[in-house]
UniProtKB/Swiss-Prot annotation:
Protein name: Photosystem I reaction center subunit IV
Family as reported in the entry's similarity comment: Belongs to the PsaE family.
Gene3D superfamilies reported in the protein's UniProt record: 2.30.30.50
Keyword Membrane listed: yes
Keywords: Membrane, Photosynthesis, Photosystem I, Thylakoid
Gene assigned in the entry: psaE
A cellular component term, taken from the record's GO annotations: plasma membrane-derived thylakoid membrane
Predominant location: membrane
Length: 75
């Protein structure tokens, strides 16, 4: 099953900050790049400045590093 925009996915990459977390697929690139799936998360990572709420809440993954938890609703 191909991963599509809007799917809820679990992260299987052990070295990722979001390992075993669930995020939403924001986009899937079809150009053949190594990490084509952009996943958006609710929480941010540790890249913010001290005392700020900043940080990153998206990351790119390969399809093999993701497990679909819930498919996006069909239109």
């Amino acid at each position: 099953m191909a991963i599509a925009r809007g799917d809820k996915v679990r992260i299987l990459r052990p070295e990722s900050y979001w390992f075993n977390e669930v995020g939403t697929v924001a986009s899937v690139d079809q150009s053949g790049i190594k990490y084509p799936v952009v996943v958006r998360f609710e929480k941010v990572n540790y890249n913010g400045f001290s005392g700020s709420d900043g940080g990153v809440n998206t990351n790119n993954f390969a399809e093999a590093e993701l497990q679909v938890v819930a498919a996006a609703a069909k239109k």
